[in-house]
UniProtKB/Swiss-Prot annotation:
Modification after translation, per record: Methylated by PrmC. Methylation increases the termination efficiency of RF1.
Cross-referenced Pfam families: PCRF, RF-1
Family: Belongs to the prokaryotic/mitochondrial release factor family.
Role: Peptide chain release factor 1 directs the termination of translation in response to the peptide chain termination codons UAG and UAA.
Lineage: Bacteria, Bacillati, Bacillota, Clostridia, Thermoanaerobacterales
Gene symbol of the encoding locus: prfA
Chief localization: cytoplasm
GO molecular function, one term: translation release factor activity, codon specific
Subcellular location: Cytoplasm
Matches recorded under HAMAP family: Rel_fac_1 (MF_00093)
Keywords: Cytoplasm, Methylation, Protein biosynthesis
Annotated protein name in UniProt: Peptide chain release factor 1
Length: 355
């Protein structure tokens, strides 16, 4: 571990020199690449330097302990060694986490697809609740949200919604939201007061750049049609809605949110690129025989990951066995505790594979 850290520190110093070099600065593309690399390893180098400083102080304190005869000063030195040892252990743990292999998609924007599952209209209303939850989380994080497509029901629910959230590290924070979300509550239409169970599925995809996925024009079939509103009625007379079919994979994406056919096509292509990248990465993972099944789940869209129980004001994440009794706050976008716990759990599983 320390040989790798020494190498990173030397690389950091070299990058420091390069980004200040007038010749390099003239080549903006090259300069931006160096700045990006410099930022990526900056935290681990800073923590390593702090670790070395603490280690040096601990050596000095131990030296004093060996040489000091005065009982009071020895007691002070022992106390200092203990404090420094705890700090050293904490920094060492942090360094191990920082050295874990990075998910190349972590810094990307994220596309979230929400679909009503079993439960009819109640499932569609719950899908709408989930959409608002993620939009409010994005607001809290200062991210930009762009609706790519939404298919509403007559009662204000959502059959399907696709939203792009743009912000640094958006995918790293929300990638564990993929799966089946279940709701238990008394529907507004239920006169007998019985609790119903409904579900919605969430798919979380990193936004794919054009360079990430090659799409040949001849592999696409593009159909245009009139936009429809809740219940299927036509909402305009121009053919502005777009359906893009990727023939080799069979993936179909429809977008009708914009009045412009061109804008709907652009949005559909964004979603298609993300789905193709996700498909390619899932196939790659399946080919790896030793692919780990982590505590936070396999990312399988059919996996039940969380239950929202309204009568008990309870939200339970089944992968973590973590229950919070503040359902309304969670639905208002207060997801930090779940997001943080899922990331920590994933890191712990990765660390096990290193041991």
């Amino acid at each position: 571990m320390f040989a790798k850290l020494d190498h990173l520190e030397a690389k950091y110093e070299e990058l420091n020199r390069l980004i200040s070099d007038p010749v390099v600065i003239q080549d903006q593309e090259r300069w931006r690449g160096y700045v990006k690399s410099h930022a990526e390893i900056g935290e681990v180098v800073a923590v390593y330097r702090e670790y070395k400083r603490v280690a040096a102080e601990m050596d000095d304190a131990r030296q004093m302990l060996r040489e000091e005869q005065d009982a009071e000063l020895r007691e002070l030195a022992e106390s200092e060694v203990e404090v420094l040892r705890e700090r050293s252990d904490e920094l060492r743990r942090r360094l191990r986490v920082l050295l874990l292999p990075k998910d190349p998609n972590d810094e990307k924007n994220v596309i979230i697809e929400i679909r009503a599952g079993t439960g009819g209209e109640e499932a569609a209303l719950f899908a709408g609740d989930l959409l608002r939850m993620y939009l409010r989380y994005a607001e809290r994080r200062g991210w930009r949200a762009e609706m790519l497509n939404v298919n509403e029901t007559d009662l204000g629910g959502i059959k399907e919604a696709i939203v792009l959230l743009e912000g640094r590290g958006a995918y790293s924070e929300l990638k564990f939201e993929s799966g089946v979300h279940r709701v238990q509550r008394v529907p507004a239409t239920e006169s007998g007061g019985r609790i119903h169970t409904s579900a919605a599925t969430v798919a979380v995809l990193p936004e794919a750049e054009e360079v990430d996925v090659e799409i040949r024009p001849e592999d696409l079939r593009i159909d245009v049609f009139c936009s429809t509103g809740p219940g299927g009625q036509s909402v305009n007379t121009t053919q502005s809605a777009v359906r893009v079919t990727h023939l080799p994979s069979g993936i179909v994406v429809s977008c009708q949110d914009e009045k412009s056919q061109h804008k709907n096509r652009d949005k559909a292509m964004k979603v298609l690129r993300a789905r193709l990248l996700d498909k390619a990465q899932q196939e790659q993972q399946e080919r790896i025989a030793s692919s780990r099944k982590t505590q936070v789940g396999t990312g399988d869209r059919s996996e039940r990951i969380r239950t929202y129980n309204f009568p008990q004001n309870r939200v339970t994440d089944h992968r973590l066995n973590l229950t919070l009794y503040r359902l309304e706050e969670v639905l208002q976008g207060d997801l930090h505790e779940f997001v943080s716990a899922l990331i920590t759990s994933d890191q712990a599983e990765k660390l096990k594979t290193l041991d």
